[in-house]
Design a protein with these regions (language model features):
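Acidic/glycine-rich phosphate/pyrophosphate-binding loops and surrounding catalytic core
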Residues: 1-212, 217, 226-234, 239-240, ...
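Active-site glycine- and acidic-residue-rich loops that bind
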Residues: 138-140, 245-248
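Glycine-rich beta-strand-to-loop/alpha-helix junction loops that act as flexible
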Residues: 220-221, 241-247, 265-267
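Active-site loop ensemble at the mouth of alpha/beta enzyme cores that anchors a bound cofactor
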Residues: 278-282
Length: 282
């Protein structure tokens, strides 16, 4: 089992445990165990669909006898009235899986919709939009899947798959040179093939990084577009570049036109509205 599927399965199991507990007594009390039925996933708001594959896993994990017919795949732009899928099976199973499936699909579709909006804003540039670790605890893998579905790029998944030397790391380490050198030594000692990114707060710090080298990407933290253009010129293509901090949808393209490779946007995952949809008997 790969790590991604393992995390998703654990999330599904936890979600069912917190929702159903010792039983869905409403459903169990009024719906016969033998009753069969169908429900459709009805889209009620325009956006980008995401989470269909996870929904299929939710149904299968709860009741493998449920049959799912998909009409619209992940990444497709949808509109009110669209039917994304129809699920057939025991009515008890349909009712007990409804809320978890909707919670996941609404959240993922909201993120994919927001990401698509940002990605379209960057069309015609060489800049890609990145997500961050500002995610819902326990749901990061799903939220980062949604970013990719929407056309964005995943930054690191967690603290384990990339070294990102931020301001606090630099300050506690005693400076940029010490932070970078210790990171390189650590990777060598541990046999870790990890990319190293460092955050800079001003041109002095940027010059220190350029003089020392040893990194893969440089993040410009809270730079204005004018500062960003100068910083990109200083880097001169030697390292990947990323803009972060204080960037809004309205200023996104201003930063992209400075020539940065990536722009990281926490809003893709930390303050997204779910896409409206419902699961109705049919």
């Amino acid at each position: 089992m790969n790590k991604e599927k393992e995390l998703i399965d654990k999330l599904i199991d936890l979600a069912f445990a917190e929702d159903i507990g010792d039983g869905d007594h409403t459903t169990l009390s009024c719906i016969p165990a033998t009753a069969m039925g169908k429900s459709k996933l009805l889209i009620k708001e325009a956006g980008v669909l995401a989470g269909i594959e996870v929904a299929k896993e939710i149904f299968n994990r709860f009741d493998p006898t449920m049959k799912v017919e998909v009409f619209i795949n992940d990444g497709t732009e949808v509109k009110p009235g669209d039917v994304a899928m129809v699920v057939e099976g025991k009515v008890q199973s349909l009712l007990q899986t409804e809320r978890l499936m909707l919670n996941v699909m609404q959240r993922m579709s909201g993120i994919a919709t927001m990401t698509r909006k940002y990605a379209k804003k960057l069309e015609g540039t060489n800049t890609r939009v990145l997500d961050t670790r500002k995610t819902t605890p326990g749901m990061r893998i799903l939220e980062k899947m949604a970013v990719k579905i929407g056309g964005g790029v995943n930054h690191r998944i967690g603290l384990f798959d990339m070294i990102l030397l931020k301001d606090n790391h630099v300050d506690f380490a005693g400076g940029i040179d010490k932070a970078i050198n210790r990171a390189k030594e650590y990777c060598k000692e541990k046999g870790k093939d990890l990319k190293i990114e460092i955050e800079v707060r001003n041109f002095d710090e940027l010059q220190q990084v350029l003089d020392l080298g040893g990194v893969d990407r440089i993040m410009f933290d809270n730079f204005t577009p004018e500062m960003t253009k100068k910083a990109v010129d200083m880097v001169a293509g030697k390292y990947e570049t990323e803009s972060s901090g204080g960037i809004t949808f309205d200023t996104l393209r201003d930063y992209a036109e400075c020539g940065v490779d990536f722009i990281s946007v926490g809003a893709l995952t930390h303050s997204v509205k779910g896409l409206d949809m419902s699961f109705k008997a049919c």
